[in-house]
């Protein structure tokens, strides 16, 4: 459901708020006060590892971490538009380039990040 809120962005493009100022809400599953990125294109919590299958969840509706911008919110939102489970790195390459541009990162840095986690 489109009910999650929280910060996004970075120092390069500035901070913005999901669910406010014309930005869409985050697509999350809600159970009581727990909100989970368990949707069609789920976002997995790797717990600082390189593999896993548990969807990330938080007590909400606002997803913040120590008041900082939330890269996880951006990954979940932009991943919906640029990456689907049926794509692979080569097929999703254009989406990766577009996501990098939208978030103000260099394409090389984003591609390197995917390679480091085995994608």
Swiss-Prot record:
CC annotations in GO: extracellular region
Co-factor(s): Ca(2+); Zn(2+)
Free-text remark on how the cofactor is bound: Binds 4 Ca(2+) ions per subunit. Binds 1 zinc ion per subunit.
EC annotation from Swiss-Prot or TrEMBL: 3.4.24.-
Compartment(s): Secreted
BP terms from Gene Ontology: proteolysis
UniProt GO MF annotations: metallopeptidase activity
Keyword annotations: Calcium, Hydrolase, Metalloprotease, Protease, Secreted, Zinc
Chief location of this protein within or outside the cell: secreted
Described purpose of this protein according to its UniProt entry: Has staphylolytic activity.
Family assignment from sequence similarity: Belongs to the peptidase M4 family.
Protein name: Achromolysin
Species this chain originates from: Achromobacter lyticus
